[in-house]
Design a protein with these regions (language model features):
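Active-site-adjacent structural elements that line small-molecule/cofactor binding pockets in enzymes
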Residues: 1-153
Length: 153
């Protein structure tokens, strides 16, 4: 991408031992998939240890996390549908991977990920349709983003 970069950024994912070694050997960043803050912390720690062994570094702010969110509550059909998807795909509890509530709940989850070592985030809105997803995204931009910037200072 422009401007021309000496090294193409390569963010890798995965939490297995081979994925951790690959990230340490080749990555310029790491992006969690559906891991919780409690699951992310040991992976980031293991990557950092593997980086020492590889005599490499990854910028301290090149560790990412992801979760789905909904300004609303767990009883809403859109949230129930998302929870069923996570349950079916992961065969694990969906609650730690979804935040349904208000700005405070979303910010609390971001803060948990920051405490675990993540500093970049992919937040996926849960919605019934395109209009709903746009509305959820707008709320995130207006209500959460300004506060997240404060968390990172």
């Amino acid at each position: 991408p422009k401007p021309v970069q000496k090294q193409l950024p390569m963010w890798l994912g995965g939490a297995s031992k081979p994925a951790i070694r690959r990230t340490a050997r080749f990555g310029t960043g790491w992006q969690a998939g559906l891991e919780t803050p409690d699951e992310v912390a040991p992976v980031i720690s293991a990557i950092r240890q593997a980086l020492v062994e590889e005599r490499r570094t990854i910028d301290h702010d090149h560790y990412g996390a992801a979760f789905s969110f909904r300004f609303g509550n767990w009883r809403e059909p859109a949230v129930q549908k998302a929870a069923a998807f996570f349950q079916g795909r992961l065969a694990r509890a969906p609650e730690p991977r979804i935040v349904a509530g208000g700005s405070d709940e979303i910010l609390a989850r971001v803060a948990e990920f920051i405490a675990a070592g993540a500093s970049k985030f992919i937040l996926s809105p849960i919605g019934d349709n395109d209009r709903d997803i746009v509305s959820q995204t707008k709320h995130l931009i207006e209500e959460v983003l300004p506060e997240v910037k404060k968390l990172n200072q």
